[in-house]
Design a protein with these regions (language model features):
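C-terminal catalytic/substrate-binding lobe primarily of soluble NAD(P)-dependent oxidoreductases
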Residues: 2-248
């Protein structure tokens, strides 16, 4: 699709809501705190990997298939480390579509020190604030029946097409919670997260992917992966995006 990649931004967002809860994260709050409050890693050509402050580069991205606009910010995620090792891009970053409310909640958790892993003494009992917070919230694995909406993961690629013209696309997969619950009995975020290593293991087992040592999934041919994704009943799509700001 591209002769030059200016930027590769992984964008992950949803419009999921849980009936009966004002705040019930669809993924582990312990892990979410780790990813969102650690300094985000960004890659830039000529600079390499560097970190920024949490919640940097706020933008509103319009996610497809009815999810709509969501506030997205940089977070720490492994794709930023893996992609630049094999793919020539001027910039690589990862953004979560957390939404304004979730961003405010995470900032408050940090301000109150509830993100701390180190234990504190509470009436003679040693307690980790983050563990306490996690135990106080509903287990995401149990929320599927009450969850409504869709989740989306994809890559926003900007650069030049094969003819040297500005091009921007969002390559994505959307999972509807109603579908994943009906077909697999798993809520959408858990299913979309788990299907990736399942497909990777199949491709390694049947010899399509032949890794040696430690490898990132982004380093292998993508078509066999995308074909298997559809065999599991889901699909991937390419949406054209605004090319403003892309220069030849």
């Amino acid at each position: 699709l591209f002769s030059r990649i200016d930027s590769c931004t992984i964008l992950d967002g949803s419009n999921l809501r849980v009936d009966g809860y004002d705040f019930a994260p669809s993924f582990s709050i312990w892990t979410t705190i780790e990813e969102c409050l650690n300094p985000p890693v960004v890659w830039e050509d000529g600079r390499g990997w560097y970190t920024t402050t949490p919640f940097s580069e706020l933008e509103i991205f319009d996610f497809p298939e009815g999810i709509g606009p969501v506030e997205c910010v940089n977070v720490e995620h492994e794709e930023v480390v893996l992609i630049p090792q094999k793919i020539d891009a001027k910039k690589v970053n990862f953004k979560y579509g957390l939404g304004a409310e979730f961003i405010t909640i995470l900032k408050t958790i940090n301000m109150l020190g509830m993100d701390r892993k180190e234990t504190v003494e509470v009436q003679g009992v040693s307690v980790s604030p983050r563990d306490l917070l996690t135990a106080s919230l509903p287990d995401p694995a149990t929320l599927g029946e009450r969850m409504r909406g869709k989740t989306c993961a994809g890559a926003l690629i900007k650069g030049l097409d094969k003819q040297g013209n500005p091009k921007a696309v969002y390559i994505y997969n959307v999972v509807d919670n109603a579908w994943s619950m009906k077909e697999f009995g798993d809520q959408a975020v858990v299913w979309q997260t788990a299907i990736n290593p399942v497909i990777a293991l199949e491709l390694i087992h049947n010899g399509t992917w032949k890794p040696r040592g430690v490898n990132g999934p982004e380093w292998f041919e993508s078509k066999p992966y995308l074909d298997l994704l559809e065999e599991y009943g889901t699909s991937w799509h390419i949406r054209d995006e605004d090319t403003a700001g892309i220069t030849k």
